[in-house]
C-alpha cells in the first residue's frame, strides 16, 4: 500500500495521459528581456467561421498554462532526472546565496545515510542545497522593497497578460470586419472589485513588471519561489492578479504510494492547479516530497508539523521546537516553496472551541492545541516565530499562516475562536514583514453565504491586505459526495470579494483520500470558480475566453466549443453520448433541442431572412410576423385545425 521500491528504482515514469497536449492546443513561449525568460502559454487553435456566418478567420486564443514541460512535445520527460532548473542562473546571478557542503538538517542526513531508503530516493539530483549568505535576505519581497525587478517578476507580468494585446491585434487583421470583430471579442463587463485594483472594463489593461514589484513590496502579493526549487515557473498570488487555485495531494498511513502522488501532481497541473500541497502523513514523507518537488513546475506547499509529528511517533505532546526547526530546514533545503504554520493557535483560544458543534477540525490546529494543553504553555510556533522568520528568509520560503481554528461546520462559522486566531495571524504578518518574509493567510472552512464577505473584510483589515487563501468555503453541510460544489459556490463568492487563492475541494472531501479522477473534478470546479471571480472583479481580459466560446457556440463550431472549455474531454464525451457521428460535429443543433427548436439556429434564420429582405433584424421579425398573420387568416383564423 505504501511506496513501491521496484516502481521507483526501475520503472518510474510519467503517466502518458498527463503529457499529451490538449486537443487543438500547443505550447508556445513568449520571450522576455533576456533569452532565458521564456514564458509558457497554451495556444488554442480555432476553425474559421463558416461562410454562411461571415467566413472570417478566428485567430488562436491564449490561456494560462500550469502544465510545465509535460505538455510540450519537444520536451524530454524523465521523472527520474526531474525538470530543468530554469531559475538557476537568475538565483546565481544575484550573488547573495551560497551552495552548502551538504544537508544541514539532522533528519535529512539520517535519511540520506539509511540503506533502507536507498531504493526509494530520487536519483536525479546532483546538486547540494543553497542558502542565503550570512547577513543576506533572498526573498522576492526583500528585492521588491529594494526597488529591484527580478526576472521572476518580469516572467509573471508576461504570464498574467496572456498575450491579450496580440490577440486583439490579430482580430483586427483577420479580414474586412476585423475592427468590428476586435471590438466585439475584446468587450467585457465592468467588474466590482471591492477595493482591489479597478481595471474597469479595459481588457487591454497591462500588468507590468513594476506593478508586480509594487504589489509584492506592499505585501499584497507573494511569489512562492524557494531558491532550492529552481525548476518552478514563477507565479504570483494576490488579489490584483488572476485568482489562483491549489490542489492538495499526499499519501496517508493507509493508502497511496510515491508513484501515485507524483501522478496526481502531474495530473493536477495538467488541468490547471497553480500550486500543489503535499499533505503526506504516511511512510516515506521525505522521499515522496523529493520526487514531487524535482518534477514540479508549480510551487509546492507543505504542513511541516505533519512530518514533525511522524518523527515523535504521532504523540503531539512529545513535539519540541528543536524537532520542528530541523523539519523546517530539511524541507526548505529540499525546495518547499511555502509552509503552512499554525502559529495562531494560542493556548487562550483552545477553550473557546469547547462549545463548537465540530470542535477543531484542522489537523495542524488539533496537534498544536493538544500540545498547548498537555504542557499548559503557549505554542512553540508562536513563541519562536521570529526564529522561524530567520529560516524562511534564508531560503525564500513563504508563510501560509494556517487557520488551525477554522470552522468545520456552518454552525461554528465566524465564532470567537476563528476570529481570535485571525487577529493573531494579522499580528504575525507584521512580524514576518519586518523580516521581508512573504505571507499569505489561510481562511475557512464552512461559512454560509451571508457571512462570507464579513470573513473577507475582516481579513483585509486585520491582516493588512496580505493575500487570503481559503478552503472553499463550503456553504452548506448537507452534501457529502458533492462538497466540490458546496465549496465551489463559496469559492466563487470569496474570490470575487478578494481572496487571492482558492484551495480546491474534491468530491471525496470528508469521505476519503482523492484519486486522480477526484483531483481532476476538484481542479475543474475550482478553475470555474476562480474564473467566475475574475469576471466579477473585471480583471483585464477575463472575458476573452468566454467571448471566444460563445462565438463558437453561436456558429456551431462544436470542436472549438469543446477545446476552448475547461474540460474538452468531458464536453466531447457528453455531446457524443447522443450524437456520436462526425457529421454531428458540424450540425446546427444538439440533442437538447433537436434541429427544429434550436434557439441559436432560429436566430440565425432571422438574420438570414433580414439580409435577404434588406432590413434590420427587428424589422425582419416584424415582417415575419406580418407574413404569418396573413397565413393565419387565409387558413380560416382557427387556432386548432382538425386533421
UniProtKB/Swiss-Prot annotation:
GO terms for cellular component: cytosol. Pathway: Cofactor biosynthesis; thiamine diphosphate biosynthesis. InterPro entries: ThiC, ThiC-associated_dom, ThiC/Bza_core_dom, ThiC/BzaA/B. Its EC number is 4.1.99.17. It catalyses: 5-amino-1-(5-phospho-beta-D-ribosyl)imidazole + S-adenosyl-L-methionine = 4-amino-2-methyl-5-(phosphooxymethyl)pyrimidine + CO + 5'-deoxyadenosine + formate + L-methionine + 3 H(+). [4Fe-4S] cluster binds at residues 590, 593, 598. GO terms for molecular function: 4 iron, 4 sulfur cluster binding; carbon-carbon lyase activity; zinc ion binding. Substrate binds at residues 248, 277, 306, 342, 362-364, 403-406, 442, 469. Binds 1 [4Fe-4S] cluster per subunit. The cluster is coordinated with 3 cysteines and an exchangeable S-adenosyl-L-methionine. Coiled coil: none annotated. Pfam families: ThiC-associated (PF13667), ThiC_Rad_SAM (PF01964). It comes from the Bacteria. HAMAP family: ThiC. Homodimer. This is Phosphomethylpyrimidine synthase.
